[in-house]
Amino acid sequence: HCGLVGSEMCIRDRNIELFQYENENYYAVYGWSSRDRENVPNPNTVWNLAKGKTLTPNTPVTLQWTSPKGVIFEREISIDEDFLFTIKQRVFNQSNATIDLAAYGILARHSAPETIGFYILHEGIVGYDDGELVELSYDDITDQKYDDRERANLEIYEITENGWIGFTDKYWMSTLVGEPQSKFKMASKYNEANDIYQADIRHPLQSIGSGQSTEIKTYLFAGAKEVNTIKTYQKEADFADFID
């Protein structure tokens, strides 16, 4: 694994580097959004290693950061042998006021990759929206309706039970998976100004009172599209219709 930088994650799968953060080509980002931007971590935040040393299937790691107002953010990251990450984002509000936060996860890809163009092979965004398969080519993503607020071509999916979204290539897939039987939003997005394609998971806004805490769990699969592995996640982890 090539490591963590701020809120960004880069992954090497055996001898294949699937995500790259050095030149900002392809990466995963986790965080919290809030109107009080100084009270949440950002891409330049320096996290402390609170627990663990090296991320392995047997040893998770926990990162921690405390905001100027005394809100503690933790991110626990674990991984299995087939490159399924479990991400637990925790907030402990030790400030004197209620805070409103919404957790998110983003897969970002700068510029469309070169695709094979074979008609029976889908390359682009793939997802699952409460029983409906989502498949978008890179051209489809750029053709989405423009959203003035986000300044991007955007499609939002309201999830009530099961959903996942990500990018699929010929042999590899990177996918954000929401916790089964939970409500959240997914988004496919294209920012023309920066030529960035995104697949997002957006969790509902939460109000966390002083002295209270919360935890959001999501999954990130970033590995080979091995049928037996994918079927195992579909059956044992309840990732609905994970075979794309």
Question: What residue spans do the PLM features occupy?
Answer:
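Positively charged, low-complexity/disordered segments
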Residues: 2-6
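Soluble non-transmembrane domains of integral membrane proteins
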Residues: 7-8, 12-243
